[in-house]
Amino acid sequence: VTTTHAAELPAGMQQFDAQMERVRKQFDVPGIAVAIVKDGQVLLERGYGVRETGKPAPVQADTLFAIASNTKAFTAASLSILADEGKLSLDDKVIDHLPWFRMSDPYVSGEMRIRDLLAHRSGLSLGAGDLLFWPTTSYTTEEVVQRLAKVPLKGGFRDRYAYDNILYAVAQKVIEQVSGQSYAAFLQQRIFAPVGMRGTRFNADHLQPGDNAAVGHAKYDFTKLRTVAPLTWSNNSGAGGIYSSAHDMALWMNVQLAGGILPDGKPLFSAKRQHEMWSMITPIPIDEVHVPELAAARPNFAGYGEGWSLSDYRGHRMVWHTGGWPGMVSRLTLLPDQKLGVVVLTNQEVGAAFNAVTFQVLDAFLQVPPTDWTAAYAKLVEKADSDAGVSWKKHQDARAAHSTPSLPLRSYATTYRDPWYGDVVIRQDGKRLRLQFAKTAQLVGTLEHWQHDSFIVRWDDRSLNADAFVNFSLTPDGALREMRMEPISPLTDFSFDFQDLVLTPVPTETAAGK
């Protein structure tokens, strides 16, 4: 436990420790780490709860958490460093640095700029291609980027916002090509070391024996909180690989709030580049407020820059990002005009916890009448759970439960191939069918008949919370035409982009040849 400059915390923070315990209890969070910086000083860095449920080791300021997509700002900063050195421009075409780079549309392949890789406006749909690396797959980063050529575009190029991860793998390859270093080495030498982030690790594979690291937790079947196996994002670390601590992220926030100036007074990146990273490229539609108590958090504008989300809060520009990972979620928030930053790292999957803490801290420093953010976000969680229940009941009500499959079970047992993911195999195991994603060890489960030629895959790993409908269509002659999938629950993480797969049966001799 570490606290500095506690006397400078505002009056609204006097009961902060008790409020943190309330957040942990309300949202069933084993452990939280928080850091707050103001005017270049670290006012608070502290851990609450435990690294792993059922074990006594406490969360501390230097406990490592997966920061997931908070990594994207490091990728943008890396490109900024190279731009400041004149080794690239964010306006360069990607193919000028990676001649083999391809999207599914030749025009987009040729026109994609490095800045476009960061701004979520490529025409890819939400989370498109994420199954190439989520959950852990055996593909390499190079294979992920090469398979991007087969991922279909669902929107117009630079037309609208749709968050993706896969283009940050391309950004990682650009950094490696231009710098001549691995991305792990570049981050360590050019960012982690100069900033002073001594405990930070490039990804889960770089965790060392004895590291003070949190363990992720998920609610199995959306109910029972248990530990989860660590994810390895070694094949897309540019999008979300980094493990860091509240202590190290406080240093990172201070460099950001200082306009890129390092503790030794030297620039990590130029003020010009920071201005561009923090400038809106892609506008984001603003959602309606579904819980009245959250009205104060609704922004007047929202958009995305280079590795950063941009919006406003109570009249102040807010630069922020969240990170989502199996078993861990986080949020980093900056109010540049206040020289204020707060990071919240948690070892569970409910973003309500980090939002409640963040807005509570911001309100205390802005000295506005307090909102009970814990209660407000509890209502949002309750509504999301209720909506998921309504969705499931609609499926149940529409089900023709006494219908039967068109074909004998053995006829569905074959290898199916999607142009970008690759193979999904169905095998008959006695009286049941088993489904396996060939490159994803965790995606193995049992098919349960739902209705007609629709099944549900129940994954063996119940921490995934990603059971999916599996729908078969037939040719006029009664042969299998294709298999499509879609997540059942609206609570399933968007990175399980099953709906983007178009799986067709592979002729037996072709499958055998593979």
Task: Walk through the language-model features, giving the residues of each.
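Cytochrome P450
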Residues: 159-163
